[in-house]
Amino acid sequence: TKNENLTHDEYRAGHVGYHNSFGRRLNNIRGYTLNVRSNQNIAEDYINSSLVKEISFNEPTDFDNQWSGYGQLMFDRFEDYITAKQPALDKAGPNGLEFDDMVAKVGGDFEHLYSGSPFQFNVNEAIIVPVMRPEHKLFKVIQFVKQNEVLSEILFNSYLKGTYSEALSKMDGLQGLIINQRTSFDVMTNFFKPESECFSNEGVLRREKFYENWDIMIEYWFYNSDYFFSSRFNKNLLSFTKKFEEKYLKSSFYKEVD
């Protein structure tokens, strides 16, 4: 979550600006996407927001107080990720190209940007529809999902990435659909310093509270918000997805991100 000294817009500016100017220069990084929680509440601020409430269930009342945004870091190998925070040889100096020590610190603004230290998790990514980005901002929605224990992990995954995703992939105006399933693989040890707040008792409790509400993030990119509301609430699609979600999900709710 953002530092209490920052407004949400100031957090966005600080993360997108200064912090990401170093994060995108981490050694061997292949991709970096920052998602900041939108100022618009998808369940309240649109003409058809009431529809979102109809397909959402078991969202914690304080969920938005637990996150301000999340970055997605892509590396070829785990070893590249764990050694990424090193000085980068990409700064012009009086004697030619120099190492920039601030890249190793990712700008050194953690205590001013965040409330406590951030935490990170590994995901298994399944690309259902590759993201096609036109030259303008897309309408991006995250569906936070928690699986119930009705099905085995293998069977649930086959249903989620099979019939459920296939139905969603046919929505008009859809520019991308990606499923991210959180794993238990440790990507924090040796990336953050041992004394970081995220390893303290308070930090662990904060992280576990956030995790208990979801284990899957489904990312939707739409050409605009009108396509989301018209396509996602198509009667035939809605009938199918509602049956699936009521049977196999413990919780499901939606958030717009920039």
Mark where each language-model region is.
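Macromolecular interaction modules
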Residues: 1-258
